[in-house]
Amino acid sequence: MNKDEVFLRQWFEILYSLTNPEANSDLRRINNEKGVEKVGQKRSAESRREGKKKRVKTQCVIKSSDKSDHDTLLKKKRRERIRRQLETLKEITPNCPQSDINAILDCVIEYTNNLRLAHYKGSQGICDDWRLFTEAGAVLYYIDT
């Protein structure tokens, strides 16, 4: 057998063992020339138990009260950040005196849609005066005298 045939045989054995969980465990054990186990190989029960013991020892235990305090602080910071960002949106958007979250978001959406419409009409040459779209939600019509 040449190297290609050996490789193909080992490759098919690996694929078969991965697709068939009841396959012979010897098929899952493929050793290289030095006798070192490869990644796809099953570990012995003893080494698995040792691994579990090591993992249990390295895990740290967090008290539930510490975790709840941490969660409470995170939620409070999140609410404050949302409140600040809503205030910023309210300041940026003209004619938005409401303090309700839904009303602020409605004003911002309406203002953004009006700006998008003004940009579209300006790019199409339909309307050259962008000042027609300055108010949030209301198009100002004026007579140039």
UniProtKB/Swiss-Prot annotation:
Give the GO molecular function terms: DNA binding; DNA-binding transcription factor activity; protein dimerization activity
A Gene Ontology annotation in the biological process aspect, one of them, is: embryo development ending in seed dormancy
| Coiled coil residues, start to end | none
The domain of life for this entry's organism is: Eukaryota
Its primary localisation, in coarse terms, equals nucleus
This protein's UniProt keywords: Developmental protein, DNA-binding, Nucleus, Transcription, Transcription regulation
InterPro entries documented for this protein: bHLH_dom, HLH_DNA-bd_sf
Localization annotation: Nucleus
Start and end residues of each stretch annotated as Disordered: 33-61
- Location of the bHLH domain: 66-115
What this protein is reported to do is described as: Required during early embryo development, for the endosperm formation.
Q: How does it assemble?
A: Homodimer.
Name listed for the protein in its UniProt record: Transcription factor MEE8
Organism whose genome encodes this protein = Arabidopsis thaliana (Mouse-ear cress)
